[in-house]
């Protein structure tokens, strides 16, 4: 039976996600940015929280873990590295591990760069990937703890997923990401179409997430750092993908 995925806002621009297994009643929250919105979504749906799947240790992703665990007695799953900074961890996971949420299966991808401990959760049967702050719609996360080559390698892992997978990321940054992408890749017709769609969605106060990975592969310039055409646009003909990615990330940092 397919997962029921709910998308909502936490804090100022974080996404909250609930993944519900109708067969067993199990429900997971991907990260725990803020308790109030998560609890309200659970109560509105008549669900009980059984699991929290943590992607990385930043406070805006784990700030509500202790409160939710106290209220629901849920299992807390977190990446191996730096989990001492996360309260009440029950299960620590790494690359290739598979977690069960009821009868739903989530595969762990290690996707470091934004932080060293960052992981993404892939629900293959539901064609969904929760990439938090590694891959955004039309963008990617800042590289705080890792290196640019490390982050590029993480993006390649996500890019390798099928085109019909849906991307669920950590923040509503799509409008800003589109604005930057157009400065580099302004003649990309798919990107221009996505920009128009994002403008319409945000004007209606609607979410831009999920997006399809196939669309990201066409419109997200960070996923195309190994495309010679992108290097040429940056006046970096002959540069490595890692060098091109680093230049893109530096430019976005300053935008």
Curated annotation (Swiss-Prot):
Zn(2+) 2 binds at residues 60-61, 133, 171. Pfam families: HAGH_C, Lactamase_B. It comes from the Bacteria. Signal peptide: none annotated. SMART domains: Lactamase_B (SM00849). CDD domains: hydroxyacylglutathione_hydrolase_MBL-fold. GO terms for biological process: methylglyoxal catabolic process to D-lactate via S-lactoyl-glutathione. GO terms for molecular function: hydroxyacylglutathione hydrolase activity; metal ion binding. InterPro entries: Clx_II_MBL, Glyoxalase_II_hydrolase, HAGH_C, Hydroxyacylglutathione_Hdrlase, Metallo-B-lactamas, RibonucZ/Hydroxyglut_hydro. It is an enzyme of class 3 (hydrolase). It catalyses: an S-(2-hydroxyacyl)glutathione + H2O = a 2-hydroxy carboxylate + glutathione + H(+). Pathway: Secondary metabolite metabolism; methylglyoxal degradation; (R)-lactate from methylglyoxal: step 2/2. Keywords: Hydrolase, Metal-binding, Zinc. Binds 2 Zn(2+) ions per subunit. NCBIfam families: GSH_gloB (TIGR03413). Monomer. Thiolesterase that catalyzes the hydrolysis of S-D-lactoyl-glutathione to form glutathione and D-lactic acid. Belongs to the metallo-beta-lactamase superfamily. Glyoxalase II family. This is Hydroxyacylglutathione hydrolase. It comes from Bradyrhizobium sp. (strain BTAi1 / ATCC BAA-1182). The gene is gloB.
């Amino acid at each position: 039976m397919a997962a029921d995925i709910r998308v909502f806002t936490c804090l100022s621009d974080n996404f909250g996600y609930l993944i519900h297994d109708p067969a067993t009643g199990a429900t997971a929250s991907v990260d725990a940015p803020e308790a109030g919105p998560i609890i309200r979504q659970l109560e509105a749906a008549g669900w009980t929280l059984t699991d929290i799947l943590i992607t990385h240790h930043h406070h805006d992703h784990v700030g509500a873990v202790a409160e939710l665990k106290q209220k629901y007695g849920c299992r807390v799953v977190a990446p191996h590295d730096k989990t001492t900074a996360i309260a009440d961890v029950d299960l620590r996971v790494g690359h290739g591990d598979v977690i069960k949420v009821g009868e739903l299966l989530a595969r762990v991808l290690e996707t470091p760069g934004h932080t060293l401990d960052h992981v993404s959760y892939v629900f293959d049967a539901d064609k969904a990937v929760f990439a938090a702050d590694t891959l955004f719609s039309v963008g990617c996360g800042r590289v705080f703890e890792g290196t640019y080559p490390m982050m590029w390698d993480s993006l390649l892992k996500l890019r390798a997923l099928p085109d019909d997978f849906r991307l669920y990321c950590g923040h509503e940054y799509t409008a800003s990401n589109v604005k930057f992408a157009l400065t580099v890749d302004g003649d990309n017709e798919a990107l221009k179409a996505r920009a128009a769609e994002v403008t319409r969605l945000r004007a209606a106060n609607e979410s831009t997430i999920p997006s399809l990975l196939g669309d990201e592969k066409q419109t997200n310039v960070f996923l195309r750092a190994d495309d010679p055409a992108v290097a040429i646009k940056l006046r970096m003909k002959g540069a490595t993908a890692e060098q091109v990615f680093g230049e893109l990330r530096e430019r976005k940092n300053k935008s």
